[in-house]
């Protein structure tokens, strides 16, 4: 039997990362990229990678010429910030395969990486500085350790039915940093924090789910779709759009060593629910909303004809980029009732070394609760 059963098709090059695919320009952290081939190579091979939209060399590759030995099919390399502090606006940079030495190879995907300008911490007012001193005297609570750029570790567990839909794996864990300040709602008696950049370390995760709910949704991107008409009308360009998130009203309860952080917020249907009051902003949505506010119209396809439609009416119809699709149901009790339950009780705690949160979270096309657990290390 001399039949050769070895795979002779295209050897696809797949890239992935389990790290947070977003960096601040000042970050020392690297994004580790895993390379996986469909099948092992017969001879030693080299794959070269490159970064698009990387003017001024904002990012750099470490070992970007990846060598794969005969008989192997995996490799990894790193992407780092050059830490030049040049950016004024967020930038999306695309990592792609440049070339390769094995003619059977073919790129399977690209990776989108986000680089944010260095977050700046607003100066506290004199009154806020007094509050912080007061918390030390009143509660023996050094709030300075909770503020500034604070490092965290995040663990995300998806509902079982969402694996293959919203995520390739059931759990993910990654490192991040949040920029935290004293909330304008803090008082002399009530220490309240506000996360002004990368709240809970999950901005990239929220942006990924938002894209899957909207611009990457297969029901959006077909020929003649009103969604496509909307994106053309606003000049949608993913590499230039900015998606940002803020989280206010994280109140420390010093006597208990806990946080109160769940509060009323509005969902897609303008119903008040109990959840984390994330405040989302997205540049493409701002432009679409402005067109509606100014009474704008666009041409859309109805059957075989192009007709003029008011942007306000289209938004009413659900042709929208509003990030409120990331707000769905109350998390103070189990509204999904999946078997087994994927709900966890929302909790926030702090001690001398760390502060941590756990909470269930869902979005419009969820199939249950995603469980999010975040642990911050207090600044020294």
Briefly describe each language-model feature range.
Residues 1-160, 379:
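Acidic/polar, low-complexity intrinsically disordered N-terminal segments immediately downstream
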Residues 122-380:
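Ser/Thr/Gly/Pro-rich, low-complexity flexible regions
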């Amino acid at each position: 039997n001399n039949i050769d059963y070895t795979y002779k098709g295209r050897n696809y090059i797949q890239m992935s990362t389990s790290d947070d695919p977003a960096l601040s320009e000042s970050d020392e952290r690297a994004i580790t990229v895993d390379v996986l081939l469909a099948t092992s190579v017969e001879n030693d091979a080299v794959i070269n990678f490159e970064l698009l939209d990387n003017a001024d060399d904002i990012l750099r590759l470490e070992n970007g010429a990846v060598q794969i030995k005969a008989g192997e099919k995996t490799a990894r390399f790193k992407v780092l910030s050059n830490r030049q502090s040049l950016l004024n606006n967020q930038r999306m940079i695309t990592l792609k395969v440049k070339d390769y030495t094995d003619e059977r190879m073919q790129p399977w995907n690209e990776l989108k990486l986000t680089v944010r300008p260095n977050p700046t911490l607003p100066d506290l007012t004199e009154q806020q500085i007094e509050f912080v001193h007061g918390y030390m005297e009143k509660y023996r609570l050094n709030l300075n350790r909770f503020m500034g750029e604070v490092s965290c570790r995040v663990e995300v567990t998806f509902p079982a039915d969402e694996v293959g839909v919203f995520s390739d794996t059931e759990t993910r864990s990654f490192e991040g940093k949040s920029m935290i300040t004293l909330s304008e709602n803090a008082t002399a008696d009530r220490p309240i924090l506000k996360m002004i950049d990368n709240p809970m370390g999950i901005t990239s995760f929220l942006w990924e789910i938002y894209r899957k709910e909207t611009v990457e949704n297969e029901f959006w991107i077909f020929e003649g779709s009103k969604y496509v008409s909307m994106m053309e009308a606003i000049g949608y360009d993913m590499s230039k759009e900015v998606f940002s998130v803020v989280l206010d009203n994280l109140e420390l309860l010093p006597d208990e060593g806990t946080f109160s952080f769940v509060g009323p917020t509005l969902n897609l249907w303008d119903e008040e629910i109990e959840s984390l009051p994330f405040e989302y902003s997205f540049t493409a949505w701002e432009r679409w909303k402005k067109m509606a506010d100014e009474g704008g119209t666009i041409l859309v396809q109805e059957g075989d004809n192009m007709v003029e439609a008011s942007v306000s009416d289209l938004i009413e119809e659900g042709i929208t980029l509003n990030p409120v699709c990331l707000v769905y149901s109350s998390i103070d009790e189990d509204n999904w009732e999946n078997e087994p339950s994927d709900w966890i009780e929302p909790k926030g705690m702090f001690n001398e070394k760390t502060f941590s949160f756990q909470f269930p979270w869902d979005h419009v096309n969820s199939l249950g609760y995603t469980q999010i657990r975040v642990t911050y290390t207090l600044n020294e």
